[in-house]
Regions:
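Short, well-structured N-terminal submotif of metal-dependent ribonuclease cores
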Residues: 1-37, 46-62
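Acidic, PIN/NYN-like endoribonuclease modules and their adjacent C-terminal/linker elements
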Residues: 1-2, 98-125
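Active-site neighborhoods of divalent-metal-dependent phosphate/nucleic-acid chemistry enzymes
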Residues: 20, 65-111
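Histidine- and aromatic-rich ligand-binding microenvironments
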Residues: 5-6, 37-38, 90-91, 112-113, ...
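Generic structural signal for small/hydrophobic residues in well-ordered secondary structure
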Residues: 6-7, 45, 77, 101
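Short, hinge-like loop/turn segments at secondary-structure boundaries
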Residues: 52-56, 84, 123-125
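A generic structural signal for short hydrophobic patches within well-formed alpha-helices
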Residues: 10-11, 42-45, 74, 116
Length: 125
């Protein structure tokens, strides 16, 4: 199994405030699953972090595998934007994360399912 972790989950894990998510994170970490993140999530978390949180974020990302955003992912994200931007308000960041999940055949772990109306996306529960 491959799981791509969305920014909202990474925020919860890094701050440790949601016991349910942290417990699920620990179970996932102890499993054989490949756990991925997108560079989009790095940008989102870094932009909202305080300097005192930088080391913890670096350590969090070191424990995971970064999935690249290549040309194919860019085209897929563009297709998602064309299809869902007006009808569902999908933004560039979410389109890129969705394209990365689809391209890696990864389940997406997010609490913001409404941001991902794409039929190709399967969710991690």
């Amino acid at each position: 199994m491959t799981v791509l972790v969305d920014s909202d989950i990474l925020i919860e894990v890094s701050r440790g405030r949601n016991a349910g998510i942290v417990a699920k994170w620990m179970d996932l970490s102890d499993s054989d699953a490949a756990v991925l993140y997108s560079p989009v999530s790095v940008a989102e978390l870094w932009a909202g972090a305080r300097p005192s949180e930088y080391d913890a974020l670096r350590n969090l990302f070191r424990a995971l595998k970064c999935t690249p955003i290549d040309e194919e992912a860019g085209r897929q994200a563009g297709d998602y934007l064309r299809q869902y931007r007006r009808s569902h308000g999908v933004e560039v960041a979410d389109a890129l994360i969705a394209a990365s999940a689809a391209g890696n055949r990864a389940e997406l772990w997010t609490r913001n399912r409404k941001h991902y109306p794409m039929k190709e996306i399967t969710f991690f529960d």
